[in-house]
Amino acid sequence: MLLAIDCGNTNTLFAIHDGNDWVAQWRSGTDSTRTADEHAVWLSQLMGLQGRSFADITACVISTVVPQALFNLRNLSRRYFKAEPVIVGEPGVRMDIEVRLDRPQDAGADRLVNALGARAVYDGALIIIDSGTATTFDVIAADGAFEGGIIAPGINLSMQALHGAAAKLPRVAIAKPARVMGKDTVSAMQSGVFWGYIDLIDGLVQRLKSEYAQPMTVVATGGVVSLFDGASKAIDHYDADLTIRGLLEVWKLNGGADT
C-alpha cells in the first residue's frame, strides 16, 4: 500500500491507497518539531483502529510546503516503512508538467501536485482553487501546462487577522450566515469573511476567464472548501481528494505501480 503525505502550513494529511482506492485518511496539525517517532506513535494507533499495521505500507510519497517538516517525515518513511520516499520537488523526481512562469522554481509543490491531480480527471483548460492557509487560483492550460495564477490570504487567516488586530472583535467560527446583513458583531464578522470570500472567488474566476478567453472548468479543493458549496456561482466541481490524487500521479510517474 502507498502512504501519501500532504504537509501544508496548517494541517498534514496522511492517506493510504491500496492500489484501487483511498482506504483511509487522517489529519494532524502541522508541527515541524514533531519527530519521526511521534508521527509513528500517532499513525500506528489510527491504523490499528482499522486493523492495519506499518507492515501494510510498502511505499511513500511526500509533498510539503514546510521545509522544516521534511526531515522527520522522510525519517518516518525510512525507519518505520523501510521505504525511500518520493518527495515532490527534489532533484530527479519527475512531474511531467510544463511550468510557464517567469521563474518556474516559484511554483509551489502543492500547486503542481494539484495540477496533476486535476489533469487525471478533468479535460480542457482548468482553474484550480485550493482554500487553505492561503487561497490559490491556478490556471492549467488545455495542453496540461501550469500557466500561473493568484495567491490570496486564506479564509481562516482573514478571520484570525480580524480578531488579532482589532481589540474588540471576538474570535468566531467561520460559518455561512443565513443573511448578508449582520445583526450583531459575530454575524457581521461571519458575513464579511464568508460572503467576502465568495465574491473573491467568483470575481477572480471571472477575471481569469476573461483574461484567458477560452472555456475553463473550475475545480475547488482544500480544508474549508465544503463551506462554499451552493454559495459560489463559479465553482463547477468540489474535489476533496484532488491533492492526494496528484500525489498518486507523482508516485506513478516515478516508477510506482503495485502499492
Swiss-Prot record:
Complexes and interactors: Homodimer.
Known EC number: 2.7.1.33
InterPro entries per UniProt: ATPase_NBD (IPR043129), Type_III_PanK (IPR004619)
Species annotation: Maricaulis maris (strain MCS10)
Family according to the record: Belongs to the type III pantothenate kinase family.
Protein name: Type III pantothenate kinase
An annotated Gene Ontology molecular function: ATP binding
CDD domains reported for this sequence: ASKHA_NBD_PanK-III
Free-text cofactor note: A monovalent cation. Ammonium or potassium.
